Amino acid sequence: MSRDFLLLDGVLRQDALRWLYGAGEPIEVIPLYNGTRWDGVKELGPILVGLDSHSSLLGEWRSSLNLQRQASKLQSSATLNDVADHLSQFITIMDNLGSYSLFRFADPLVSSYWLGSYSPSAYESLLGPISEWLVALPPPNWAPSQSGEWQSYRPQTNSHKLKGKLNHLADDQVQALEQAYRRSFKERLYGWLIEDYPQTLSSLGEQERGQWLEQRLFDAEAWGLVSERSIAIWLERCACWGDDFATRSDSPYQAWLARTPGVQNLAPEQRIQALDEDCLAG
């Protein structure tokens, strides 16, 4: 008989184990980092929860946008251990260059982009004993009135098996995860900007906010910035001095260049961080 599971991301729900065990109902819980080299931080990894048919946790997940951002729902007729064993194959991933890394596949945003990057014929291999993987993809935080998406992934019978290891990411998957990261980064930037510099974005419509964020990211990257810190500094200067602060002849940035010897010879990352330090120093 098929049963429901929740797959929680421990980074997004750092009180997950306390919350689950405090629910006061029969559940089975397996942190997927159990017995691995990451056992010491298992509460921050993927956590699989087996539910009974009357679980209040399932109802809470269905009604809570916040919880849907932290967990997805699986269905399977297999045991909790069998589902956990299958999912454990994805704890680390490898790309075409041979690079290994930890994979936060339990983050619904990540799983949405990752699973969506495969053709439907891949799901029989990819999902294994899982008969459905249901992911809620809420609208981005800069466009809350947009409709969210429910994405259901199911295996197709008689599909060709995936070649190679399941945790190997081809170029399509790598690109999809880059898109997931970019959306997550934009949401974090928006949350910070709307709190500290609300005047920058509050007058824009939802679509315009997304376009503004994307254009500022593009500008920062074109200028040579790579790190999150430097890109955040760039957006802060845009909020304070205008979107064209780096090119406008009368901007405070040009005045700073003129009075600060040697900074023009710094690499972009060093230069924007030196600018930030001087701004903080007043």
Language model segments and positions:
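A contiguous, surface-oriented mixed alpha/beta subdomain in the mid-to-C-terminal portion of proteins
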Residues: 1-43, 48-56, 74-81, 88-102, ...
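Short amphipathic alpha-helices in soluble, non-transmembrane regions
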Residues: 62-63, 87
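A surface-exposed, charged beta-strand/loop segment in the N-terminal or early-internal portion
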Residues: 65-67
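Short acidic, gly/pro-rich beta-turn/loop elements at beta-sheet edges
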Residues: 59
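Non-catalytic terminal regions of proteins
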Residues: 70-72
